[in-house]
Structure formats: structure tokens, C-alpha cells
């Protein structure tokens, strides 16, 4: 065979020479140069090494299977034949040296066992011969004794008890032969066919395990008759036994204890009561609640169903995780005095932000859109008498929930009332929020520098709301102030700090941070940003925080001026970055130990929120069926709403959903915090909605879709404008009302006949003006008897378009000839009038 070098072999197998030399060295070959010759044996060694290194088996096959198939034909009857095919399969296994050695050992052991068996057999035969000889000798001696015995002895022997005879016979009887021990057979190597055949037979073979003895039952004749015999070829007849259960049915209803959480599905409730789900569904249908097997029930409904079905109910709280979290958050430490949190509330345009600007020496109100506050703002101010934290709330009617959150998170409420305006609706609402939160009120009577200011009117109005001034014997201080010139501001701060001293506000700075989310928004460059007011403990950068259904690690903290801070103590407002979403305003913020616990609680709250929402959605469906029966006929204005902060979004959704009447309604199909994105534009396109952006703008992708599809997208920065535009749109959807204006009345004085028009009424116009081709009514005794159209109007045989009051004319009524003297003809017109909400 032609000799091959390493280089040529590398070209054949398409691999680099260096790699081939490396593999040959790993295989134990001595090749180091590309020009060296490779023999066939070296190739085989290299191939075996490569196969073994890649997990392939290089051994020869150890098993060979031979199959044989023979076909024969059998004649049945005249010309009919049957083909018989016989298949045989044999498998030969090549045994290894270890198996051969084991077989030799088995043969040697078998030979030794055979020799031992032969020896034992010889000993057994000798023992049997000796026993037989002894038995013959005993029988001979017994016969001789019987011949010489007297007749009396025979009688006494006949009267012996049978038991003694049996005992004597048993004693004289030889021992039973012991079963010959056979040498144990040594199993030979088994082929695959034998093992497969044994497995097949083992499936039909009864189990050889020892079973516990069954309790015996006395079978009656009927039982014997009920059984039947089943015989088969080569098998014994077997008598079947009737199946009998081993339990008794309960004689009375079983009362079970049913554990019900805040929500439970119909299937879970049925399982706990040990009844079928169909019975629960049927029972709820009778109660008037059509449900399905997977429907979620609230706790009250499930309790009612379980009690009506006769079971005991155990109400279970699903807040195990929350309670565990509360236990972990308990902290004992030294409490110190903290700064008060003061919320400024009042009616819109009464000067809340201007008052805060004077205190902070800032100019926030100048830069606000529309001159009104639309966000809740948090600031802390260092005064000569100590630090005070202020929350500035919007005064517009739409921000009710925002003001309620401000009252919840505060210690003291400053109620700002304009001296020239008096007590307004939002002033009353602020008083209600403060009383509901149980916080003291300090009234700031603003705009005292105006000539039309009337402080006494303010006192009378607030006294009607149970806010009694100190001068009248109450406990509410009234401080006249002017945010413009600064009159009374120092007295106001002094009154606030005096209230704070009375409250004895304490906090534990060494504890983990705990607070409340004041506001949240989605920043394009920084992600979710939440404004947090720390109420207790210290919040530090790097802490893992939990806010409602959101969690995250605090990546950065900023104060109200946008400067980064490392930590925030009690009563300090900060903005935090790092949450996984924008939390709801008003959510509690807590610092937890690790991310695992935060994620677990957040997911639990998300699932709980979803379950409660589904249960509430289903609860009132049947009750409101008549109210919602005509909902399909309503015209709906769909809106996709995006706002800059969570509080504004909530306020806008509440205000817009409150607009409408029985014919038109507003539906916010999508809402969120942040800019208008491409997905928002697609949602508006799919739902035929209008895109509203409140203090946000659309990105390039969204603008492209809006331009291509011709969507209506509008930007706003004042809440008044968006509400007014939606009202106008709803007014346009209402359509128009048709009103009738009476133009004139003519009294019939005479009736003439005309071959062309039939009856012609000679009339005197008594009121207004009569026009031709206008709808008319014929009144007789002030009762309408005909309604039609004025076809002909003449004066002195001339066709005229109109006839004024005090003039005579002839009137021809189309398709009506029953005109009589004394009738009145009323001419009117129909006018469409725009409707309003």
C-alpha cells in the first residue's frame, strides 16, 4: 500500500498539520514532523483514540442476533390454502473473560454439590436400612408377647381408651421419612430471549407475596347460588365471591368546618364542604347569583353559602405575609422630637402656594400653568423656631383624593381662606378631610390687605362647619395674613409650632425608614421617581424599599431642590429612584431586609389586588342588571390619558368618568404615567379613542402613527382646559333637540270651494305671520284635529309668500277638505337646538 506522510493525511482529513500532530501525540504516537510516514496500524491507533475521546465505543459487537423466517402452505378443503409463517430469532452473546471465569467457578461448585449430594444419599440409605431392621425386630417381639397373654389381659386391652391406643400407635410408628435433599441447580447464563419470555409470563403469574389472611365469612345458600363457576382448559374451577364494602353510610348530615379567606373559588368552596361543585352552583342560582365553577367569590358571599348548606365557617385572614412583615418592622429605640408635617389646604386661588412662597422665599406660583397648583408638593423649611415640613395641595375640585392623602400624612392642617371670597366648596371639603384624619386646624385668613376683606364673614362661615375661633371660646386659632406683603406670617408659624409642641411629636431616627408616597411620576431619563415623606426612622441610599405593589433598591435620593442626599430622617421629603414601577400616591413605604422578602410581599399584594378586583366586579352584576340594560345604547367617548404624575392621572380619571349623562359617557380605555408612546397610539387606534397628554408629550414613534392614521391628539397643562374640551365633545355627541316655534295663527271666517285645491279657507291673520309651504295644525275648539302642510296662500287672487297679522287671505290645506268656520290654523316651524350636559 502507498505510504502516506503526516502532511498528506492532514490534507485528506481536512485538518491543520499542527492539530493532527497534537492528536497523534495524545494517541501515544511518536510523530513530530509533517514529513514522517504514517503506517496503517498507526492510523488505526489514531482512529481508536479519536473515537474514545469523543465517547464512541471501539469494542467489537458483543451481541449477534440471527433471525430466520420459513413459510409453508397448508391445504384446507379443495382448493383453499393457508400460508403459515414461522419466525425464529436467536441472540448470541460474546462473553468476557470475567464471565468465563465466573462460569468455571459455578461448574466447580456444581460438581462439589453433586458429590456432597451423593454422600448424603448413601448415608440416608444406610439409616433407612437400620430403621427397617429395628422395626422388624420390634414386630416379632410384639407377636410373641400377644400369643402368651391371658384372656383377662385381652379384655382390659379392649376397654382401653381410644386416645391411649392412638398414642401408643403413634409412639410405635417410625419417624416420617425426611425429604431427600436435592442439589441446588446452578443457573446457567440466560439469553435475551429467555429473559423476555420470563417477563411475559410474569405478567400473568399471581403474586407470590404472602398476604394477610382474609376474614372468614359464612356464605349462605343465596351467596353460593350467586357465584358462578369459570372453568377452562387446564385450569381449576373458581367460585367468585360477591364484593362487599367495608364502611357504612352516615345516618345524618356531616357538618364540616370551612375555612374561607378574603376570596375563594366555587370549586375550592365545594371541595372544603365535600360536595360537588354542581350543587354549589345550583344553590347559588336559586339565590339569584349565576356563577361558574372557576368564579371567585368574596368572603361574605362564600360565608352565606356555606352557612346555608349547614356548615361551620371559619374566616381566615390572608394577610399572613403582611403580619409577618409587620413583626419584622418592629423596632425599639430612643425616640426624639421631630419636626411637624403641615399641609396647606383651601379653595383654588385663595393663595396657598403664594403663602408658602413667602415662607420659603421662593417663587413657585409664578411658574405654575394657569396660575393654579396641580401637583402635591413637599418642602421643608428651616425657621428661627425650628424646622417645618410643608405639603402644598391643589385646591381644584378634581383633586379631592390628593387632598385626602395630604390630610392623612400630616400632623397639622393650615386652612387658607381668602378674606375677600369667603368659605367655598373646597374649603368645606378640606375641613372634612382634616376632621376625618383627626388633625388640628390652624386657619390662615389670607388677602387681608385687600380693601374688600371681611374676616368676620370667614369666622361665621367656618363656625357653621364646627370650626370655632379661639376668640369665641373654641380651640382653632385664626391668623390674619397677607402672602403678598408678609403680614402675620410669623404669627402663623408660631401658632403652628405651638400646636406641634402640644402634640409632642416623636420619632426614632435609628429605626429603618418608614414613610408614605406623596407623588410619583415616570421620568424619561431616570425611570420611576417617587416623592416620599419619611415619617419615622431614617431612609438611606442603598436600602431595599417596598411601596405597595412595587419594590426596588434606592439608587439615588434628591431633596426638593434637586440636590442629591445620602439619607433622610423623620419629616424630610425626598425623591427616590430605583423602584420597578410608579407606586400609587398614598402607598406606605417600608424598608425591608432583603430583595427576596420585598419581591415575595409585592407579588402577594399584586395577586390579592387582582382577586379582590375580580370579586368586586362580579358582585354587583345581577343587582345592576336593570341599570345597565340600556348601556349599549349610550354613546361613548373613548380616551387614552397620559399624565406626568400619578396624582394628576387619578384626579383626571375621576373627573372625566364623572362627566356624561344617560345618553353619553366617557370611558378612559388606557391611562398611565409618562410620555405618549407607540403602544398608546396603537391602543387609541384600536379603540377609536382620543389621545390626551397632560404635561407630557408624544415620542417620535407615537407621532408617526398619529400622523399616518389621522388620530386626534391634544396636549394640556391646565386641568380646566381638558375638562372643558371633554364637555364640549360630549355636547356634540348629544345631537340636537327639535323645537317648534309658532309663526302665526289665522282664524277661518268663511269656506270656499276650488276645483283645483278643494276647500279654501278664507281667514283673518290674528297673530304673527302666515308663511306658505310651512307645516300647519288645524284646531277646532282648541283641539288639534289635523296636522299637515300649507299648500296655497293667496291674497286677492294673487299667490303670496306670507301674510302679516290683521290681513285677510285664502289658505288651501293639502289633502284636507274638512275646514269649518271658526277653526284656527296654526303655522309653525321646526328648529334644531344644540343640547348641553
UniProtKB/Swiss-Prot annotation:
It is found in: Cytoplasm. Residues 446-449 are annotated as: G4. Keywords: Cytoplasm, GTP-binding, Initiation factor, Nucleotide-binding, Protein biosynthesis. Residues 97-253 are annotated as: Disordered. InterPro entries: DNA-bd_dom_put_sf, EF-G-like_DII, IF2_assoc_dom_bac, IF2_II, IF2_N, P-loop_NTPase, Small_GTP-bd, T_Tr_GTP-bd_dom. Residues 392-395 are annotated as: G3. Residues 337-504 form the tr-type G domain. Residues 97-139, 176-197, 219-229 have a biased composition (Basic and acidic residues). Residues 482-484 are annotated as: G5. Residues 198-208, 230-244 have a biased composition (Basic residues). Residues 371-375 are annotated as: G2. GTP binds at residues 346-353, 392-396, 446-449. PANTHER family: TR-TYPE G DOMAIN-CONTAINING PROTEIN, TRANSLATION INITIATION FACTOR IF-2-RELATED. One of the essential components for the initiation of protein synthesis. Protects formylmethionyl-tRNA from spontaneous hydrolysis and promotes its binding to the 30S ribosomal subunits. Also involved in the hydrolysis of GTP during the formation of the 70S ribosomal complex. NCBIfam families: IF-2 (TIGR00487), small_GTP (TIGR00231). Belongs to the TRAFAC class translation factor GTPase superfamily. Classic translation factor GTPase family. IF-2 subfamily. This is Translation initiation factor IF-2. It comes from Stutzerimonas stutzeri (strain A1501) (Pseudomonas stutzeri).
Amino acid at each position: 500500500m502507498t505510504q502516506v506522510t503526516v502532511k498528506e493525511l492532514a490534507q485528506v482529513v481536512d485538518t491543520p498539520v499542527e492539530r493532527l500532530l497534537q492528536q497523534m501525540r495524545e494517541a501515544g504516537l511518536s510523530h513530530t514532523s509533517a514529513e514522517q510516514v504514517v503506517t496503517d496500524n498507526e492510523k488505526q491507533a489514531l482512529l481508536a483514540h479519536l473515537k474514545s475521546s469523543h465517547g464512541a465505543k471501539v469494542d467489537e459487537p458483543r451481541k449477534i442476533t440471527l433471525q430466520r423466517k420459513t413459510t409453508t402452505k397448508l391445504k384446507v378443503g379443495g382448493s383453499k390454502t393457508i400460508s403459515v409463517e414461522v419466525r425464529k430469532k436467536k441472540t448470541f452473546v460474546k462473553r468476557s473473560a470475567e464471565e468465563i471465569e465466573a462460569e468455571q467457578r459455578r461448574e466447580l461448585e456444581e460438581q462439589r454439590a453433586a458429590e456432597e449430594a451423593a454422600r448424603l444419599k448413601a448415608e440416608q440409605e444406610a439409616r433407612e436400612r437400620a430403621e427397617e431392621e429395628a422395626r422388624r425386630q420390634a414386630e416379632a417381639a410384639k407377636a410373641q408377647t400377644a400369643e402368651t397373654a391371658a384372656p383377662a389381659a385381652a379384655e382390659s386391652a379392649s376397654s382401653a381408651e381410644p386416645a391411649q391406643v392412638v398414642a401408643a400407635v403413634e409412639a410405635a410408628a417410625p419417624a416420617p421419612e425426611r425429604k431427600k435433599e436435592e442439589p441446588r441447580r446452578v443457573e446457567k447464563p440466560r439469553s435475551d430471549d429467555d429473559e423476555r419470555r420470563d417477563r411475559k409470563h410474569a405478567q400473568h403469574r399471581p403474586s407470590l407475596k404472602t398476604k394477610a389472611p382474609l376474614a372468614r365469612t359464612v356464605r349462605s345458600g343465596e351467596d353460593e347460588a350467586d357465584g358462578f363457576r369459570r372453568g377452562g382448559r387446564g385450569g381449576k374451577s373458581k367460585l367468585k365471591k360477591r364484593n362487599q364494602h367495608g364502611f357504612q353510610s352516615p345516618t345524618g348530615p356531616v357538618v364540616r368546618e370551612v375555612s374561607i379567606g378574603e376570596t375563594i373559588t366555587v370549586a375550592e368552596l365545594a371541595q372544603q364542604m365535600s360536595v360537588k361543585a354542581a350543587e354549589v352552583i345550583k344553590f347559588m342560582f336559586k339565590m339569584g347569583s349565576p356563577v361558574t365553577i372557576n368564579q371567585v367569590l368574596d368572603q361574605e358571599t362564600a360565608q352565606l353559602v356555606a352557612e346555608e348548606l349547614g356548615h361551620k365557617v371559619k374566616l381566615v385572614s390572608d394577610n399572613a405575609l403582611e403580619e409577618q412583615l409587620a413583626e419584622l418592622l418592629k423596632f425599639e429605640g430612643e425616640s426624639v422630637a421631630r419636626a411637624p408635617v403641615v399641609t396647606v389646604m383651601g379653595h383654588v386661588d385663595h393663595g396657598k402656594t403664594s403663602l408658602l412662597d413667602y415662607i420659603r422665599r421662593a417663587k413657585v406660583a409664578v411658574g405654575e400653568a394657569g396660575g393654579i397648583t396641580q401637583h402635591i408638593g413637599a418642602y421643608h423649611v428651616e425657621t428661627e423656631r425650628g424646622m417645618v415640613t410643608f405639603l402644598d395641595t391643589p385646591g381644584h375640585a378634581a383633586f379631592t383624593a390628593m387632598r385626602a392623602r395630604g390630610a392623612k400624612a400630616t400632623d397639622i392642617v393650615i386652612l387658607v381662606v381668602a378674606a375677600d371670597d369667603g368659605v367655598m366648596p373646597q374649603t368645606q371639603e378640606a375641613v372634612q378631610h382634616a376632621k376625618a384624619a383627626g388633625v388640628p386646624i390652624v386657619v390662615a385668613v389670607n388677602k387681608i390687605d385687600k380693601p374688600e376683606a371681611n374676616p368676620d364673614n370667614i369666622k361665621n362661615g367656618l363656625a357653621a362647619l364646627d370650626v370655632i375661633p379661639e376668640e369665641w371660646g373654641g380651640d382653632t386659632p385664626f391668623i390674619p395674613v397677607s402672602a403678598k406683603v408678609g403680614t402675620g406670617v410669623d404669627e402663623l408659624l408660631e401658632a403652628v409650632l405651638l400646636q406641634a409642641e402640644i402634640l409632642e411629636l416623636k420619632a426614632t431616627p435609628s429605626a429603618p425608614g418608614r414613610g408614605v408616597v406623596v407623588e410619583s411620576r415616570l421620568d424619561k431619563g431616570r425611570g420611576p421617581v417617587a416623592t416620599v415623606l419619611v415619617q419615622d426612622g431614617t431612609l438611606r441610599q442603598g436600602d431595599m424599599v417596598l411601596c405597595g405593589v412595587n419594590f426596588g433598591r434606592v439608587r439615588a435620593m434628591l431633596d426638593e431642590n434637586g440636590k442629591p442626599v445620602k439619607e433622610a430622617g423623620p419629616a424630610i421629603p425626598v425623591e427616590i429612584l430605583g423602584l420597578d414601577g410608579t407606586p400609587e400616591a398614598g402607598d406606605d413605604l417600608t424598608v425591608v431586609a432583603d430583595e427576596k422578602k420585598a419581591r415575595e410581599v409585592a407579588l402577594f399584594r399584586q395577586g390579592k389586588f387582582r382577586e379582590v378586583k375580580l370579586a368586586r366586579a362580579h358582585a354587583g352584576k345581577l343587582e345592576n342588571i336593570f341599570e345597565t340594560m340600556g348601556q349599549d345604547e349610550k354613546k361613548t367617548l373613548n380616551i387614552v390619558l397620559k399624565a406626568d404624575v400619578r396624582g394628576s392621572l387619578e384626579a383626571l380619571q375621576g373627573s372625566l368618568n364623572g362627566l356624561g349623562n344617560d345618553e353619553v359617557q366617557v370611558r378612559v380605555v388606557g391611562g398611565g404615567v409618562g410620555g405618549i408612546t407607540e403602544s398608546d397610539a396603537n391602543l387609541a387606534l384600536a379603540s377609536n379613542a382620543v389621545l390626551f397628554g397632560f404635561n407630557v408629550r408624544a415620542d417620535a414613534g407615537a407621532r408617526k402613527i398619529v400622523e399616518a392614521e389621522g388620530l386626534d391628539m391634544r396636549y394640556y397643562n391646565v386641568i380646566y382646559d381638558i375638562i372643558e374640551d371633554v364637555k364640549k365633545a360630549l355636547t356634540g355627541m348629544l345631537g340636537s333637540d327639535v323645537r317648534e316655534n309658532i309663526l302665526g295663527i289665522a282664524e277661518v271666517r268663511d269656506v270656499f270651494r276650488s276645483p283645483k285645491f278643494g276647500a279654501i279657507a278664507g281667514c283673518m291673520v290674528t297673530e304673527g305671520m302666515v308663511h306658505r309651504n310651512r307645516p300647519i295644525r288645524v284646531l277646532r275648539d282648541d283641539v288639534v284635529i289635523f296636522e299637515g302642510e300649507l299648500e296655497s296662500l293667496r291674497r286677492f287672487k294673487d299667490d303670496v309668500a306670507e301674510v302679516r297679522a290683521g290681513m285677510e287671505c285664502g289658505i288651501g290645506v293639502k289633502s284636507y277638505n274638512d275646514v269649518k268656520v271658526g277653526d284656527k290654523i296654526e303655522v309653525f316651524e321646526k328648529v334644531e337646538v344644540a343640547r348641553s350636559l
